[in-house]
């Protein structure tokens, strides 16, 4: 509790939180917030560095206890008579690691991310959902959604799928969490938990060695480009173990392969030596009998005792697969000064992500034409001054470097975006999709009960979503996207 004489307020934490245990609890909480005109925020696991699940002077609905998991042999969506194949229904509080463990026991896996503590159907799914292992071969997480159960702004429980409330269903497939309603559960396609062989190529050099980027990172990006063309997905991770050193690792994921020797031979047949450039290199290989095991072993992106900030950019297939693509990208990324615990990594798009054009999603159309997502994770010092400095440096220095890789596009991922992104409407969704999202928001939540930072409709509120600006939402949104 705050002392009355204290000049330090509560901050961006909610004053009250309803830790819900059922859908009826959520309905009662939403109606309570609406009746009393409260600033409402939705928290799933809180795995969010941009403050979307918190706000000052607010009332929070915390969904972490909704832990139901139901497996379906042939899921039939409400209002339909057609089976959609194997699927699983996950409650709003189920985390990725829990879904992976349940799947491993029952012979399936979902399209999920690497961080085990991320909620499987919260902001990850509603924001798009990228998997370093599965997206190249399966698509985005939102490509797998068959049905949502949602508590709307008036407290009703709504089914959203291809046959019911199609506008809401579309908006929840990339329009962002905590914006259109409270998702209580989602049903997503499942896949067989097939084996994967993972090769790992690691390089390390002194931070002062400019050839680390020009030769080392360039070579790893060239390998990633080459193996993508061979239908093999991969992920590049760059970090600074100490203030005087840099390291990078490229993992290639050979789906449905259990022959270590074959994987290593393929890698070595394409790789070039780097030792002559003062760069140490090593290669290893491992076989996972179940792909979910690879995801379950990944560490969380959050370093202990620190907060983080994130920024991201899409790299188009045209840029990445150009002859000079790897060299260009390595050169641009070298402008980012990495400190200990900072991380720079790619997520493999292209492949099935590009092929799933028949599936309508709310994300920016450029996702279907992208080859990679590049994400920068900055560690934030535990002080007010440190946080402000890191945030301002991210916006003023880091993001322009990321956007310079593909300057004609400048598309970002809201789930991993700059918390101060000024052009979020066009960066995250594009003008046409944002206009459609704004119309859906107006239809389902005309009073803006649900509001998140840099979410659909947030431009007509102040930075914390407390005070509404004078202009109407539709008019303001239209002017911002040039309509």
From Swiss-Prot:
Disruption phenotype: Abolishes the production of clavine alkaloids but also of more complex alkaloids such as ergopeptines. Accumulates N-methyl-dimethylallyltryptophan (Me-DMAT) and traces of dimethylallyltryptophan (DMAT). Keywords: Alkaloid metabolism, FAD, Flavoprotein, Oxidoreductase. Pathway: Alkaloid biosynthesis; ergot alkaloid biosynthesis. InterPro entries: BBE (IPR012951), FAD-bd_PCMH (IPR016166), FAD-bd_PCMH-like_sf (IPR036318), FAD-bd_PCMH_sub2 (IPR016169), FAD-linked_Oxidoreductase (IPR050416), Oxid_FAD_bind_N (IPR006094). One of its GO terms (biological process) is indole alkaloid biosynthetic process. Its cofactor is FAD. Disulfide bonds: none annotated. Its EC number is 1.-.-.-. SUPFAM superfamilies: FAD-binding/transporter-associated domain-like. It holds the Pfam family BBE. FAD-linked oxidoreductase; part of the gene cluster that mediates the biosynthesis of fungal ergot alkaloid. DmaW catalyzes the first step of ergot alkaloid biosynthesis by condensing dimethylallyl diphosphate (DMAP) and tryptophan to form 4-dimethylallyl-L-tryptophan. The second step is catalyzed by the methyltransferase easF that methylates 4-dimethylallyl-L-tryptophan in the presence of S-adenosyl-L-methionine, resulting in the formation of 4-dimethylallyl-L-abrine. Belongs to the oxygen-dependent FAD-linked oxidoreductase family. This is FAD-linked oxidoreductase easE. It comes from Claviceps purpurea (Ergot fungus). The gene is easE.
